[in-house]
Amino acid sequence: MSGVSSVMLGLRPATRIFFRSNISVSPSRTFVSYIGRSQSTSILKNAPNLEDNVTNLQKIIPKRFFSQTSILKSRWKPIFNEETTNRYVRLNRFQQYQQQRSGGNPLGSMTILGLSLMAGIYFGSPYLFEHVPPFTYFKTHPKNLVYALLGINVAVFGLWQLPKCWRFLQKYMLLQKDYVTSKISIIGSAFSHQEFWHLGMNMLALWSFGTSLATMLGASNFFSLYMNSAIAGSLFSLWYPKLARLAIVGPSLGASGALFGVLGCFSYLFPHAKILLFVFPVPGGAWVAFLASVAWNAAGCALRWGSFDYAAHLGGSMMGVLYGWYISKAVEKQRQRRLQAAGRWF
């Protein structure tokens, strides 16, 4: 099966910010520091113009006991409003980071959880799509499964636009590398996008490759491929900082781990399919484009350029190739059985 697929494969950014329990982002994106709630004002008896100072102070802060947080917000709010072009800003201090880091990283338990989920998804998907609604609907409409995954990603992106949801999203939809806030983030981060360009590129890649691959593999196999590639990307993303001995790492998010898995499986099964990068055809077909992406991601891990999560890309790519190899072997065995069965009649 060959065809022309347009791809603008989005990347999974490894953000350089750390969200912690004792700091928060207000709806106006101002900085809130962890400072004592109140502090009494000190009055010097011999201070000049004491009455004027007290009067001016009361105009600004009408209470005797005032919060230093309110002063910080009033002074620094204009600066932070000008400089915060992203969804979040750098918040925590290095001391807080060290305290969180010293608390330990459940990397082993996350790995066991990830492998268990991958096994459960692989063996449970056939039953799920055979007997459990609404998954049974996707068995006969595999393309709609792709649209459903696309819709979930868009919905989570919409939640990122609501400041009231940030605390929930920071806990469950960001994959923290040094201090895991929730084990659900190993999957949740794969459905999370904070910027429109990131969402748009990933969803275009999902639509380009996913609709064709879901029709060929079936809903159950495609769902297993997508979810396990996402989990593999998260596991690689967690292990890479430890193996590379990186001192400071930020959280990551995005569906690119799963999408590189889809690309890997597609290119393995259809190596000569034509690929368009934006509007330009890639020479050599899908397999050449995939190998180029692997080389680029490997170089990114080694040279550590940019802020993308190259390890997650590699993890998803390896899972996609593994699925492609397994499916090709299964198809070949079925073909041999059919030939043997047909030979008995002649």
Curated annotation (Swiss-Prot):
Q: What is its main location?
A: mitochondrion
Compartment list: Mitochondrion inner membrane
Recorded superkingdom: Eukaryota
Q: Where along the chain is the transit peptide annotated?
A: 1-73
| Cellular component aspect of the GO annotation | mitochondrial inner membrane
* Transcription in keyword set: no
Spans traversing the lipid bilayer: 109-129, 145-165, 203-223, 246-266, 275-295, 308-328
Q: Which InterPro entries match?
A: Peptidase_S54_rhomboid_dom, Rhomboid-like_sf, Rhomboid_protease_S54
Pfam families per UniProt: Rhomboid (PF01694)
Annotated active site residues, numbered on this chain, are 256, 313
Q: Summarize the record's disruption phenotype note.
A: Impairs mitochondrial integrity.
Molecular function in Gene Ontology: serine-type endopeptidase activity
The answer to keyword Methyltransferase applying to this record is no
**EC number of the protein:** 3.4.21.105
Which UniProt keyword terms apply here?
A: Hydrolase, Membrane, Mitochondrion, Mitochondrion inner membrane, Protease, Serine protease, Transit peptide, Transmembrane, Transmembrane helix
Catalyzed reaction equations: Cleaves type-1 transmembrane domains using a catalytic dyad composed of serine and histidine that are contributed by different transmembrane domains
Q: Which SUPFAM superfamilies match?
A: Rhomboid-like (SSF144091)
Q: How does it sit in the membrane?
A: Multi-pass membrane protein
Q: What is the effect of changing residue 202 to A?
A: Abolishes protease activity
| Outcome of mutating residue 313 to A | Abolishes protease activity
Q: What does the UniProt function comment say about this protein? A: Mitochondrial rhomboid serine protease processing the mitochondrial membrane fusion regulator MGM1, and the cytochrome c peroxidase (CCP1). Required for TIM11 stability, ATP synthase complex assembly, mitochondrial morphology, cytochrome c (CYC1) storage and mitochondrial genome maintenance.
Task: Tell me the protein family, please.
Answer: Belongs to the peptidase S54 family.
State the protein's name: Rhomboid protein 1, mitochondrial
The organism is Saccharomyces cerevisiae (strain ATCC 204508 / S288c) (Baker's yeast)
Q: What gene is it encoded by?
A: PCP1
